[in-house]
Regions:
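Acidic/histidine-rich catalytic cores and adjacent linkers
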Residues: 1-23, 55-225
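Short, surface-exposed amphipathic charged segments that create phosphate/polyanion-binding patches used
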Residues: 39-51
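Inter-helix linker motif
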Residues: 24-40
Length: 225
């Protein structure tokens, strides 16, 4: 009775446990995990584009070492494969966090591969849904589903079906604003601290690091009142 809402990913086993242990709780799909579905679909599209470029590159003459001669024919497949291989972070990151170089790479993708860029916009569109929340978020999600269904990118068409399947829990997250973002961030930081604490003989040092860095623990230092 004390648990009224549960934020979790969409795994079936989690739904079963919540239904068994907290039958009256409202289950909310965690926005971080839902957007991660779109990010995974986008990366699958990037790998498809990269593999297509590698296939083209294999049909091109092998390049010799050193600077190519002036009469050497262009190798668009090699160049495209090279640039796409390093495009992951430009596609993954939020637009406001892009470096100048990553922004240029994204602009190159928009110009040279409209399908991959459309996949990027779909990922950003789903992220926007959770930034507006509430009824506006649900209206935006309706538009996103319609767009994804007719985008002609099979993996995003399948993602639209998955979103519809879990629509009730996603709507609940939009209504109640629940997210595991803070917990996920804290877990990531603790993993970093675990690497820092490697080599200590017991977990006490790791616990102390976590308390100091993340727990708000501010002990009084000797000689400093």
């Amino acid at each position: 009775a004390l648990i009224t809402h549960v934020s979790a990913d969409a795994a079936d086993w989690i739904a079963d446990v919540v239904a068994d242990r907290c039958p009256d709780a409202i289950r909310c799909a965690d926005p971080f995990h839902v957007v991660a579905w779109a990010t995974e679909a986008l990366d699958a599209e990037r790998r498809r584009a990269w593999n297509d470029a590698r296939t083209l590159a294999r049909s091109e003459p092998k390049r010799r070492r050193g600077r190519p001669a002036n009469h050497t024919p262009p190798s668009p497949g090699h160049e495209r494969a090279r640039r796409l291989k390093g495009a992951r972070y430009a596609l993954w990151k939020n637009p406001e966090d892009l470096t100048e170089r990553q922004s240029q790479k994204l602009a190159w993708i928009a110009k040279t591969d409209t399908r991959l860029y459309r996949a990027y916009l779909l990922k950003e569109g789903l992220r926007h849904v959770f930034s507006v929340k509430g009824q506006d978020g649900k209206d935006a999600l309706d538009k996103w589903i319609s767009w994804a269904r007719r985008c002609r990118i099979p993996i995003f068409v399948e993602l639209a079906r998955r979103i519809v399947k879990h629509r009730d829990t996603i709507d609940a997250a939009l209504d109640h604003g629940l997210s595991q973002g803070l917990i996920e961030s804290t877990n990531t930081k603790i993993r970093v601290l675990t690497r820092i604490a490697f080599g200590f003989h017991n977990p006490t040092a790791l616990i102390a690091l976590a308390m100091l860095a993340l727990g708000g623990h501010r002990p009084t230092l000797p000689g400093r009142g």
